UniProtKB/Swiss-Prot annotation:
This is Apoptosis-resistant E3 ubiquitin protein ligase 1. Filamin repeats lie at residues 64-158. Detected in brain, testis, heart, liver, lung and kidney with very low levels in skeletal muscle and spleen. Disruption phenotype: Mice show significant and stepwise decreases in indicators of inflammatory injury, such as bronchoalveolar lavage fluid protein concentration and cell count, as well as decreases in pro-inflammatory cytokine release. SMART domains: HECTc (SM00119). GO terms for biological process: apoptotic process; negative regulation of apoptotic process; protein K11-linked ubiquitination; protein K33-linked ubiquitination; protein ubiquitination; regulation of inflammatory response; ubiquitin-dependent protein catabolic process. It is an enzyme of class 2 (transferase). It catalyses: S-ubiquitinyl-[E2 ubiquitin-conjugating enzyme]-L-cysteine + [acceptor protein]-L-lysine = [E2 ubiquitin-conjugating enzyme]-L-cysteine + N(6)-ubiquitinyl-[acceptor protein]-L-lysine. The keyword Transferase applies. Residues 483-823 form the HECT domain. The gene is Arel1.
Length: 823
């Protein structure tokens, strides 16, 4: 009986297994017949399906080489394990149609990946490597033959990295704060990681004790760095990714503060503080709210040459009328002085003067016979005018203030109400620039004010008919009788003999072409100091006689037009397609020339002459304060004295900095004085000078020319790969381009600078590089890349993995973009 029951049970089980097998077999046959088209079926047979001898996406697995959560910036990898339907390993070297797509969910940014078949015992594993820079949630889709693998898509969260002090900033930053004694002031700090991610998920945001604040008083004891008594508290808000530093000072005076994270100063963490009493604060508020009226302070003027805040001085610079326009530095006070003296008078004792502060200017005047005003100095109320705070003067024991605008020699003043004077100036400055000194806030203020300037002028269309074959001449002719109102209108460009209607395309093309016609060296209006097409352009001091100065006015108006169009936003945004020298940009905003401009503008001259003078003893050199000027045939044309009696004044170790700055003034500014004046005349017709003055020369370039984004596709299309084995060309180069595609614009600029010596491309992009960007297969393995900047060559060794390429390239461009690894 027992055997009978057991036999029945075995038969039933066998029957059920048989039925299951038949159902599975039927399902595979139906799937084979209905769902597999000819292309996907390939050489598979129904027998393969019956045996499960085919690649099945649902049987494959994905394993991750990291544990969640993980920080951005690292080389990440996961593995796709391929299996037949029957569970046997599927050889990955066979074509399987593996597709991996990784994208940021919120930003919709695709991440480049590399695939590599691992030579494991079963050879059924594909390693997928990638790098992410932006924190957030990512979707990872893995497909085989169009079907998702296992549980694909997968979702992974990458957290921001640790706080990087150089990326962390104060919101609404000011170089000088005006506070009230005993009243708290809160500073908003935005912690960022290396890739500018907010640290909302980072432990560093909760590490509030890592933020420190050091304050010392400015004055006679500044060298001793005396600490000041103050109260400080730090809190954080993880939702807004901000840290709040609450500061209270209990003593009046001028101080210097520095905010640090883990003993490293943050990006804009250094600033001055003026602390006023309640009564002084009310006086300053009343001064600033008084519109259009100059507030004056009694002071004593010391000899500017005694000022120690600057190591060098320049001869008097007489501003031309075009540099004064329009209505910025010279306003309501113009009528009250018969003349203006720019040369500081040699005084043995302090001179009693009066300092006037208005919304637009800060002026120093002397009164003759107590009734006749005589203007001694005028400074614009703009970020370029810097104050230095010193201790009491030796004569009257009054607090001292040094004013330096980078144009005139610094002026040293002592004043009983110095702190009120400085606070009035600072508050007026803050009103002038829109309440913040950060670049983006200044851009927003600039564009808002520029729209206000042209608000009453209609932005209706005006037709501009030009010839493509004589673009510059026809454009000059078409705009010859244009008023400022016409330049403010929306240009509708019509190219002769072309029927295209201008819905924006012809206008943008005209801006592109006219910028090239004006600022390319072939027009001879602008020139380079070196023969390299990567060099910056500067007004040409040797322009042909037929190129009239009116053309520089036209160039200035064009730049002003681009700035105005960009202020309108949207489709009107228009960048200036040019790469100007730093010294030319500095002259646009009225800055004084400095020998350091040679380093970027004329690097060959800087290396050959400037560095030689800086690094050598001048006692045995027969060098004088004069410059030899040669003609085109190389013969000496004339000798130009850099100062009165310069041909008889030797250059010594004591005055060589003074000599180099005079040389910069002559070579970079004096030789192109007329060209710059006419350029400014055209520019200031559309853009007031006081608006441009809120930027420095680097910010001005960003405002006019943009960031100059580097296009990876353009890079890849024009880069030339030289030499190399199969491993180098097929694997290392694939890893290299994947790493390059993952780099930020800042990192791409560093890579470009590492290889070419410049962080910017010519207007034509990589195609315009001469010689072309070359990637040379270096005869080394697993070492740092090197570069030959003179030949635009990147020497790339061989590597064993994507992670190694990423690590070595990152190290090279971060540590060596200014010399490390460069040849």
């Amino acid at each position: 009986m027992f055997y009978v029951i057991g036999g029945i049970i075995v038969s039933v089980v066998a029957f059920f297994f048989t039925i299951k097998f038949l159902f599975e077999l039927a399902a595979r046959v139906v799937s084979f017949l209905q769902n597999e088209d000819r292309e996907r079926r390939g050489d598979r047979t129904i027998y393969d399906y019956v045996r499960g001898n085919y690649l099945d996406p649902r049987s494959c697995k994905v394993s991750w080489d990291w544990k969640d959560p993980y920080e951005v910036g690292h080389s990440m990898a996961f593995r796709v394990h391929l299996f037949y339907k029957n569970g046997q390993p599927f050889p990955a070297h066979r074509p399987v149609g593996l597709r991996v797509h990784i994208s940021h969910v919120e930003l919709a940014v695709d991440i480049p990946v590399t695939q590599e078949v691992l030579q494991e015992p079963n050879s059924n594993v594909v390693k997928v490597a990638f790098t992410v820079r932006k924190a957030g949630r990512y979707e990872i889709t893995v497909k085989l033959g169009g079907l998702n693998v296992a549980y694909s898509p997968y979702y992974k969260i990458f957290q921001p990295g640790m706080v990087v002090p150089s990326k962390t900033k104060i919101v609404c930053h000011f170089s000088t704060l005006v506070l009230t004694c005993g009243q708290p002031h809160t500073l908003q700090i935005v912690p960022r990681d290396e890739y500018d991610n907010p640290t909302n998920n980072s432990m560093s945001l909760r590490d509030e004790h890592s933020y420190s604040l050091a304050i010392h008083e400015l004055g006679p004891q500044e060298e001793e760095n005396n600490e000041v008594s103050f109260e400080k508290s730090v809190t954080s808000n993880r939702q807004t990714c901000q840290v709040f530093l609450r500061l209270t000072l209990h003593s009046r005076g001028c101080f210097h503060a520095c905010i640090s994270y883990q003993n490293q100063p943050i990006n804009n963490g250094e600033f001055d503080i003026i602390v006023l009493s309640e009564n002084e604060k009310n006086i300053v508020e009343r001064n600033v709210s008084t519109s259009g009226v100059s507030i004056y302070f009694e002071a004593y003027l010391y000899n500017a040459n005694n000022c120690t805040s600057t190591p060098w001085h320049l001869p008097p610079m007489h501003m031309s009328s075009s540099q004064r326009r329009p209505s910025t530095a010279i306003e309501e006070d113009d009528e009250d002085s018969p003349s203006e003296c720019h040369t500081p008078e040699k005084v043995k004792k302090p001179k009693k003067v009066y300092c006037y502060v208005s919304p637009k200017q800060f002026s120093v005047k002397e009164f003759y016979l107590k009734i006749i005003p005589w203007r001694l100095y005028t400074f614009r109320v703009c970020p370029g005018t810097k104050f230095s705070y010193l201790g009491p003067d030796p004569v009257h024991k009054l607090l001292t203030l040094v004013v330096d605008d980078g144009i005139q020699p610094p002026v040293e003043l002592s004043c009983k109400e110095r702190n009120i004077l400085a606070a009035t100036f600072i508050r007026s400055l803050h009103k002038n620039i829109g309440g913040s000194e950060t670049f983006q806030d200044k851009v927003n203020f600039f564009q808002r004010e520029l729209r206000q300037v042209h608000m009453k002028r209609p932005h209706s269309k005006v037709t501009l008919k030009v010839s493509r074959h004589a673009l510059l001449e026809s454009s000059l002719k078409a705009t010859r009788n244009f008023s400022i109102s016409d330049w403010s209108k929306n240009f509708e460009v019509v190219f002769q003999d072309e029927e295209a209607l201008d819905w924006g395309g012809p206008r943008r093309e005209w801006f592109e072409l006219i910028c090239k016609a004006l600022f390319d060296t072939t027009s001879q209006l602008f020139a380079r100091f070196t023969d390299s097409n990567q060099a910056l352009v500067h007004p040409n001091p040797n322009r042909p006689a037929h190129l009239r100065l009116k053309m520089y006015e036209f160039a200035g108006r064009l730049v002003g037009k681009c700035l105005y169009e960009s202020s309108l936003g949207g489709a009107y945004k228009q960048l200036v397609r040019a790469r100007f020298t730093r010294s030319f940009l500095a002259q646009i905003i009225g800055l004084r020339m400095h020998y350091k401009y040679f380093e970027t503008d004329d690097p060959e001259f800087y290396k050959s002459k400037v560095c030689f003078i800086l690094n050598n003893d001048m006692s045995e050199m027969e060098l004088v304060f004069a410059e030899e000027k040669y003609n085109k045939s190389g013969q000496l044309d004339k000798i130009v004295e850099l100062m009165t009696g310069g041909a008889q004044t030797p250059v010594t170790n004591a005055n060589k900095i003074f000599y180099l700055n005079l040389l910069a003034q002559y070579r970079l500014a004096s030789q192109v004085k007329e060209e710059v004046e006419h350029f400014l005349k055209g520019l200031n017709e559309l853009v007031p000078e006081n608006l441009l003055a809120i930027f420095d020369e680097n910010e001005l370039e960003l405002l006019m020319c943009g960031t100059g984004d580097i296009n990876v596709s353009d890079f890849k299309a024009h880069a030339v790969v030289v030499g190399g084995s199969w491993h180098f060309r097929e694997k290392v180069m694939r890893w290299f381009w994947a790493v390059v595609s993952s780099l930020t614009q800042e990192e791409l600029a560093r890579l470009l600078q590492f290889t070419t010596g410049s962080s910017q491309l010519p207007p034509g992009g990589f195609a315009a590089l001469c010689p072309s960007f070359q990637i040379i297969a270096a005869p080394t393995h697993s070492t740092l890349p090197t570069a030959h900047t003179c030949f635009n060559q990147l020497c790339l060794p061989t590597y064993d993995s994507y992670e190694e390429v990423h690590r070595m390239l990152q190290l090279a461009i971060s540590e060596g973009c200014e010399g490390f690894g460069m040849l």
